[in-house]
Amino acid sequence: MTAPDVRPRWPQGREGCMALAFDLDGPTGDAMLNGTIWQKPEYFTFGGYGPFRALGRLLDMLEQYDVPATFFIPAWVVEQWPRQCAAIVEKGHEVAYHGYRHESFYTLSGDQQRQVMEKSRKIFWQHLGIRAGGFRTPSGDWHPETPGVLLEAGVTYSSSMRGDDRPYAISVPGYQQPLVEIPGKWEMDDYASLAYTREPDFPKGLDRSASYALTLDNWCREFDGAMDEGLCLTTLFHPKISGKPGRILLLEQFLAHMKQRDVWFARCQEVADWYLQEQQHD
């Protein structure tokens, strides 16, 4: 007996979906939340390099290869670098929520999460004129109340969990429309292979950067495996990590490899909208 085909029916009959995504964290995160970053100018500039210097390089690359992307941005970064963040929208890419200062949502109560989302919504509207429809949880996990908080804030999709290789629905009591999840995987996080800081030790235990050639090979294998099965792949790349001169060449090679296949390159919001439409038809 043949197993049922679980491949999604991608637009235009494409063989798979690639939702390229970047987390424009800047210097936000644990060191900012606990205050130690203000005693570590080097670490602050390590993060600030992302929106200040690397972002423009990435936008030029995406334009060259004609690939859309989604940028998940802590609202504090939008406040500090509004012109750079506005350039993302002007270039036709998507911007989405990523906390205010990259808070760990699994440590916050429902009310605290609502405060973060409301602040983020106001800042995105004030500086970008955008009501974002997407969210990626900082820290890679969330509180049981988070899906409801997101729907309450007008969010239609998340790219936070790891439960599938395809978009799926998260039903929330009291809401007719589910929250769409576009799952990622740590293998497609550039921190896992390319991040390095001496102090603070982050990621902990990582004492050197991986070979660029091996990193590219890993990414290409993950992409090819996903496309061979007709799945959806997204990335957790960071401009401050991958947007440096030597590493942008790595990303260019990855984009060139992906462009060889007949896949749907989509913003995450487009993937979520497609999923909701397909779900209505099934």
What annotation goes with each model-predicted range?
Residues 181-206:
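Glycine-rich, positively charged active-site loop/lid region within alpha/beta enzyme cores that binds
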Residues 1-134, 139-187, 213-235, 243-282:
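Catalytic alpha-helical scaffold of carbohydrate-active enzymes acting on polysaccharides/glycoconjugates
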Residues 132, 198-211, 239-240:
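Surface-exposed cleft-lining segments at the edges of enzyme active sites
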